[in-house]
């Protein structure tokens, strides 16, 4: 139909239209504040994301070709473990997935209660994020090989698996189309899943500049949210207008370049500039015995020396 063609084929009007809708939804959530906006919607969206993802994984794993994808995902190729490009890509993915280096964790961390055990909270956030990423792999990689079983091309000219926008907007839609009637429901559920994941990420990203404007410059939250939202939409529109040139470039520069470097600067600030005793007193408010535990014996040295050195070394090897 004309609607399905409009949704699946590349269209500038569609891209800018959905960008506007997406920014509008994000602005509505952020303008409502922390409790009525971020907390309320995150508590609704995250369980929905888990349920949808698990349901899709179960369905995809029952399809022909899924086991080949599962082997491709879970059986490691140790010959590539020292590849600088792979390490930089993995580091970029980790920084992007955890929203490190962009202020999100700092802002969200400032909203939790003072009596929270920060090392435990940090570990739980990392565990949850890694679990979601692992589940996403259990869905996407088997789905790619199910698509191959249906006659869809899944390898690029270079011999690597198709990834990025081409995977989402070409390979997977072709898979859903090949599934017949079931593909309509699976495809709809998959893109709802993608939208939920994107919204939960975008609200955390937008909260950073909004929080700064509200706290540092005393700007009204509603005004700050709409103003910054308009700036984000303008940048998004510029990327849509020059999609082939800018999209991959922006992804590479932000996740593989800017975020690791910014995270290294955060490590330097936390390890060398910020008073160690101030950090310890903050940690003690949630865990009075933290000073005598393994965390405090390792963390200061790790952040001060190892993290910046490893990030810089890995970053340098990527060139």
Task: Set out the residue ranges of the language-model regions.
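Loop-to-transmembrane helix boundary motifs in multi-pass membrane proteins
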Residues: 16, 128-134, 184-187, 196-199, ...
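Hydrophobic alpha-helical segments of multi-pass membrane transport proteins
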Residues: 195-205, 225-236, 254-283
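Hydrophobic alpha-helical transmembrane segments of multi-pass membrane proteins
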Residues: 21-28, 88-99, 189-200, 254, ...
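Membrane-embedded translocation segments of transport machinery
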Residues: 39, 43-199, 223-224
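A generic transmembrane alpha-helix motif of multi-pass inner-membrane proteins
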Residues: 245-270, 292-319
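Inter-helical loop and helix-membrane interface segments of multi-pass membrane transporters/permeases
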Residues: 1-35, 67-88, 162-169, 182, ...
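Hydrophobic alpha-helical segments and their helix-loop junctions in multi-pass secondary transporters
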Residues: 1, 50-74, 146, 239, ...
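Membrane-interface loop-to-helix entry segments
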Residues: 17-59, 255
